From Swiss-Prot:
NCBIfam families: lpxC
GO terms of molecular function: metal ion binding; UDP-3-O-acyl-N-acetylglucosamine deacetylase activity
Protein name: UDP-3-O-acyl-N-acetylglucosamine deacetylase
Organism whose genome encodes this protein: Vesicomyosocius okutanii subsp. Calyptogena okutanii (strain HA)
GO process annotations (BP): lipid A biosynthetic process
Stated role: Catalyzes the hydrolysis of UDP-3-O-myristoyl-N-acetylglucosamine to form UDP-3-O-myristoylglucosamine and acetate, the committed step in lipid A biosynthesis.
InterPro entries on file: Ribosomal_Su5_D2-typ_SF (IPR020568), UDP-acyl_GlcNac_deAcase (IPR004463), UDP-acyl_GlcNac_deAcase_C (IPR011334), UDP-acyl_N-AcGlcN_deAcase_N (IPR015870)
Name of one Pfam family that matches: LpxC
GO CC annotation terms, alphabetical: membrane
Residues bound to Zn(2+): H77, H236, D240
Family: Belongs to the LpxC family.
Catalysis: reaction(s): a UDP-3-O-[(3R)-3-hydroxyacyl]-N-acetyl-alpha-D-glucosamine + H2O = a UDP-3-O-[(3R)-3-hydroxyacyl]-alpha-D-glucosamine + acetate
E.C. designation(s): 3.5.1.108
Gene for this chain: lpxC
Amino acid sequence: MIKQRTIKKEVKARGIGIHSGSVVNMTLIPAKEDHGVVFRRMDVGDKLVRAHSAFVNEVVLSTGLENKGVKVSTVEHLMSAFSALGIDNVLVELDSFEVPIMDGSSAPFIFLVQSAGIEEQSTHKKFFVIKDTIRVENGDSWAQVSKYEGFKVSLEIDFDHKKVKESGEKLSINFSKQSYLKEISRARTFGYMKDVEMMQRQNLALGASMDNAIALSDDDVLNEDGMRYQNEFVKHKILDIVGDLYLLGSNLIGHYEGYKTGHLLNDQLLSTILAKPDTWSIETFEEDNSPIQFYSEDWQNSL
């Protein structure tokens, strides 16, 4: 059978919070079967927040969670890494309200999980299987999921910027055949430097810098080291989508398609999916009857 996964040992990391600009300490701790991904805020009495769509409260520029007044911001890159490596059960301790931004991609979190090691557990892994097409729209933006044997993301973005358009704004990734670790994990978040400077004057985005984002001028990329991928912009948006989808609580089996999507539309899609239980099912699989194994290479090489 395909089994649930946790990490083998506790592992720690430290980084800057994108909102506060302060140092955030994070610890990943192994968890038992069916525990799920849960955040624990050590700075507010060890309060817990489950990583699930039901607790999403923030969708502007990033995805944040809240439970009984306790918030955890900017979870999408960490959730994307957990999804890519099939981590079902882990406790994430934080001493702040936000996950550290690290370098603006999910690669540091992938490295962190791999450093801890991955432990297969004794219980069947649960998959979120899409059985019908579910679509949401907001203006000319739209997102949908449909039935698919495996996991695939097809996305088109539309940014009025020379470098973004030159890089390629359309991409489809079939994760049964293409490696998340190689093709997606190193893609960084991006934005206009003038917008960051304006927000910082308002005491916002205090941790944002060229160390954790691709900074854009009106017509160029300002980072001295340039781009990590030729089409890094659309790849980062796919990284975000993988993280947002993992807030369904299980790895998705289906095809996500979108145009000009963001965290808001992803949240609307997840809420719509969960409100239509006849369009999906939670399933377990034996090795020989599973759908085309998404993340197959990444999962096997990570054990």
